[in-house]
Amino acid sequence: MSNKKRSKNENDESTSLPLENSELLIEYIHNLKSCLNVYRREIQEKNKYISIIKNDLSFHECILTNVNVVWSVFNNDLLNLLCNNEQKEEGEEIIKQRNIGDEINEYNNLTKLQNDENIKNNNMIKEDLEDDANQNILMKSPYYNIENFLQVFLKYINKKKKKVKVKVKDEGKKEKIEDKKYEQDDEEENEEEEEEEEEEEGEEENKEDEEFFKTFVSFNLYHNNNEKNISYDKNLVKQENDNKDEARGNDNMCGNYDIHNERGEMLDKGKSYSGDEKINTSDNAKSCSGDEKVITSDNGKSYDYVKNESEEQEEKENMLNNKKRSLECNPNEAKKICFSLEEKIGTVQSVKLKEYNELSKENIEKNKHDDNNICNYLSHNEGENVIEREDKLFNKLNNKNYRNEEEKKKNQINFDYLKKKIKNNQDVFEETIQKCFLINLKKTLNLINKIMYLKNVEFRKYNLDYIRKINYEKCFYYKNYIDIKKKISELQKDNESLKIQVDRLEKKKATLIYKLNNDNIRKHILDNNIKDYQNGIDNSKVSYFDEGENPYNRNNKNYRTDNKNSDDNNNNNNYYYNNYNSDDNYNSEDNEYNNGNYRFRNNYKKDSLNEDDVKKNPLKVCHKINSDSNIFVNFENIITKQNIIHSEPFRNLLKESNELYITLKEKEKENIILKNEILKMENKKDEEYEHLLNNTIEDKKELTRSIKELEINMMTCNMEKDKISNKVNTLEYEINVLKNIDKNQTMQLQQKENDILKMKLYIEKLKLSEKNLKDKIILLENEKDKMLSGIHIKDNSFNEESKSEEGKIQLRDIQNDNDEKYDDEKKRFKELFIENQKLKEELNKKRNVEEELHSLRKNYNIINEEIEEITKEFEKKQEQVDEMILQIKNKELELLDKFNNKMNKAYVEEKLKELKNTYEEKMKHINNIYKKHDDFVNIYLNLFFQARKNAILSDSQREEQMNLFIKLKDKYDIIFQKKIELTDILKNVYDCNKKLIGHCQDLEKENSTLQNKLSNEIKNSKMLSKNLSKNSDDHLLIEENNELRRRLICSVCMENFRNYIIIKCGHIYCNNCIFNNLKTRNRKCPQCKVPFDKKDLQKIFLD
């Protein structure tokens, strides 16, 4: 919370919150607790990340320390070899100048000094081993365990040398039997000492065998040996003190050879020389193996040194066989150790199994070479085992007091002989050690190169920006590919639907073309109609009235036949009307019209004329002709099919239908062109789609190689993105929640202030009402007292004047009025008292609510303060985390700088230059590979970007094609809509034709009715003809009536009376005919062809 909010809360301490919002506060508190839990989880996650980073740092430190340890050991070993060679060269020059006696004295002095120095070195070793840093360095070297190699190498040699010691002891016993005369007193003491030594050596041999077996069973040998070295150094101090006492008591010609490691580790007398040891000798500078003591005696005999050659050869062969048998199994066990160490490397560095197999093969070959070197070395060191026997004899003879000058001379000769042997053996030993260490250097270089390669690979994997770019581009390209597929599928569906519609339209088109262009069918129909008319004319010649037949029935028969013909003609003419096309058919129509008129007339002649009647009654015939002619004149204007065909509206309809047919043909051509274009576009799209598919397949093959390597990084990036997004979302949600909380709190405070002000005003009003009520109560009580006092006075006065009854009545009335007033005032008082109690209860409740709200406000302030403290702590922890990350980065940089400085130091000796050159060549080769890989990556990126550009271009082209296709589709839709409109117009034309046909049928029915009327009128005329003489005047009246009726009937339909007049021309027609012309938009007068509108019409009333 800010200071402003605190100041508001402090100023508003008097205000109180209602109980309704307490639930909201509880919810807010719950939300704050959840937020705190979220912050704690985030802090835990950050601590986890920090621990992971620390582990990575420790791993890199381990690598650096291992490399430093290995290189320091090998450098020290090589320096030791160089120093030994220099000392040898100096020693050879000194030997020529000095005598043997001086050498022995100087050697004894050196041994004393070396013993003192060894004690000091042992103390230093203890201090170093106590340090944790040195222990960690030694514990963290799994790549090449030098001390393990050293122990195994020494134990091979020690076992075989102990066998030789046993043989030397047996020979010593034989010599003691020969010298019993001279050594009776000393022999007993020596036997006891020898027995003790045998027991100790037997125990040591068993222990060493067990340890040697454990070296090949357990892989944690190195760590166990480091723990043993501490206890081992303590025992060394005791042994050295004992050696000092023995050196003081014994005047040896050649003292003990003391061997110490350059790193400060002392070696037992039971251990032999390895590569990292210094050999301190006398001024002769001759070096021995680690457990050998070169001792000569004055009393020694020459036969101890000069033996038969056959015995020496047998002993050599036996030793070699035993040593070879012991080493047959050891190489495989040593190889197992190497494999186990390499597997440890693989677990740390996550190297593949294939690499391990390759390493194992190389190590097998190298170990074979090492084993052969060791065997050669042991074969050369057989002479040293012979010297051990002579050493022990020499120790025994030193304890004796008798020494002769002759024996001294022999010892001097033998000493020179031994020196020569030691030189030869030592040269071979140094060569084997050099070979061993060169092999070990190659191993370490291979491991270092692999470590460097692994670092480069990991650096590439953790290049997150590069991975994000590739993932983004891949997702973008894949989304576009899916969108294109969806669009293509949708277009295919639309294309199929359009094909179906096109097929339907083609079918309709075929039907329309068949109906519109088939003129032969129309001509055939016309020819059939003409033949029918001719047959009708031929049949009209037949007599109309036969004997025994009623003329009425005959007329009906003719009427039925005519109706049948008319129905047939209607069926043919329906097709004819719909398919009528050109103006060339008007001649045939005129012929049909004339034939129709001719038929009509002949039909009426059938009814009227007959040859027999002419012969019999010529007067009647004349009368019939006149009457028929009059009737024909009356019905000439009857509407027939021919009149309809020749009418102008029908011709206009035909013209419009021709125009529509022409437009349809044009639009069909356009549709065909558009279809061809659509097919071309589809073919192009299919080709492009196939091309794109081929490109994508090729790109996939190239991308899968890189995607397999990048999938792991994608997962890591996605996990990081999800975590970051979740964090951002949580923070945004928390910010929004806090903002909403602030807003709600401010709104609540404002509402509460308003409510409190209202409550204060209401309380003041209640207080005023209380005061007024109290005043009223006091006044009422005073009035009551006055009334009671007046009543008592009146009672007394009325008692005195009780005689008068009128006064009593008045008193009673007054008392009743007073009682009523008193009761009313009591009721009011009670009501006011109840209201006061209610108001007091409400005030108490409000006070309690205010107290509760005050407590809640305090709690809320406390919670806000806790939240502020938590946020501050969270910010501090974030700062600490950032500082830790910076420190870790700085440490990484420092370690890398140290590593680079150590690797870039110049090597001291010329022999390592060759190794440096090989290493530089390998690094160059690795850098070239790395450059090639980078070039390949750049090429791949360029290809990927080119493919992406091609995809974008293809997308743009496809979009353009889609736009063209959409435009063509819109045009096609417009044409299709026009076609639909034309079909609607044709339907309307067909409907109009149907209506006209129905109308024609109605007219035919009316004709039939008129024919019936005519037949009746003919009958009447016949009757009238008989009475012509009598009723000639009536005939004239009938004729006049018919003429007048003809004038009143409409000249178009010949059915209805004339109702409407056209003002422009003055012609009169019926209602139906005029409005039919208006509906068909033929707004012209049928007779004079003058145009008119509805405004030009006017109704006429003849009645």
UniProtKB/Swiss-Prot annotation:
It comes from Plasmodium falciparum (isolate 3D7). Gene3D superfamilies: Zinc/RING finger domain, C3HC4 (zinc finger). It comes from the Eukaryota. Keywords: Coiled coil, Host cell membrane, Host membrane, Membrane, Metal-binding, Zinc, Zinc-finger. Residues 184-210 have a biased composition (Acidic residues). This is Trophozoite exported protein 1. It is a peripheral membrane protein. PANTHER family: BIFUNCTIONAL APOPTOSIS REGULATOR (PTHR15898:SF13). InterPro entries: Znf_C3HC4_RING-type, Znf_RING, Znf_RING/FYVE/PHD, Znf_RING_CS. Residues 173-212, 304-330, 478-518, 650-791, 819-932, 993-1030 form a coiled coil. Residues 568-585 have a biased composition (Low complexity).
